């Protein structure tokens, strides 16, 4: 219990430290590209929804000679609803998509944070950097698959009135927090030359840290505003995870 409390406290307290570190050392430039990319994806999905709505509407119009009021109303509804659906889908999967695509940048950001904190330099190697980025992408995709599967299974709890719905929301939040957090922690584990298996074991030993770190990232997503800030929060989360791991490693 003490270990769990220590890990949770470390995970949460690392965020203000991460923000100060990023600001003091001018690392904010590494968050610009993810934020711009995030905005582009949101806009693209909304326009894709409008485009698909127009396309479906044209098909209906071509195959319907005499459109009555109901069909016209349906066409208008499709054009309005599809962009909303696309946007809602991004709200729920946006954090995951951003994590997968931005993992190369988060890898670099985490490395710079460790260098600042410990003074340890990591000589640049194009080959090693490519290997680290590839590993980060593989782990992000693996975690995403597990995350989505467990989230889908939790949805069945909604068939149990009230209690099941509450349990489903809570479990999905914890699952997402754990896998987001473990992904951010792996950026440090890969620099410590942990194998994928060793990284999984390390995350299991620090599971409460993973949940605390990922919870800060996940909570805004549940509040429907986090999708716009997922890229920024993700960068801070990667640095926060590095800070926590170094702190806990230094403790006896």
Task: Pin down the residues of each PLM region.
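Interfacial aromatic "cap" segments that immediately flank transmembrane helices
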Residues: 18-36, 122-153, 180-220
């Amino acid at each position: 219990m003490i270990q769990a409390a220590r890990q949770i406290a470390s995970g949460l307290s690392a965020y203000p430290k991460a923000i100060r570190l990023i600001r003091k050392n001018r690392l904010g430039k590494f968050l610009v590209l993810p934020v711009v990319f995030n905005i582009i994806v949101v806009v693209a999905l909304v326009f894709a929804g409008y485009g698909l709505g127009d396309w479906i509407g044209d098909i209906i119009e071509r195959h319907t000679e005499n459109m009555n009021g109901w069909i016209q109303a349906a066409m208008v509804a499709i054009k309005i609803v599809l962009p909303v659906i696309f946007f809602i889908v991004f709200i729920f999967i946006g954090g995951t998509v951003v994590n997968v695509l931005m993992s190369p940048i988060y890898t670099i950001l985490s490395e710079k944070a460790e260098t600042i904190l410990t003074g340890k330099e990591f000589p640049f190697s194009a080959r090693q950097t490519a290997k680290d980025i590839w590993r980060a992408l593989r782990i992000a995709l693996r975690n995403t698959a597990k995350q989505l599967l467990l989230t889908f299974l939790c949805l069945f709890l909604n068939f149990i009135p009230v209690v099941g719905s509450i349990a489903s929301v809570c479990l999905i939040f914890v699952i997402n927090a754990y896998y987001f957090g473990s992904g951010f922690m792996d950026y440090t584990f890969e620099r410590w030359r942990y194998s994928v298996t060793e990284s999984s074991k390390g995350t299991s030993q620090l599971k409460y840290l993973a949940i605390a770190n990922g919870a800060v990232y996940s909570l805004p997503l549940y509040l429907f505003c986090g999708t716009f800030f997922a890229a920024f929060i993700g960068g801070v989360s990667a640095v926060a995870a590095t800070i926590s791991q170094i702190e806990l490693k230094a403790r006896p």
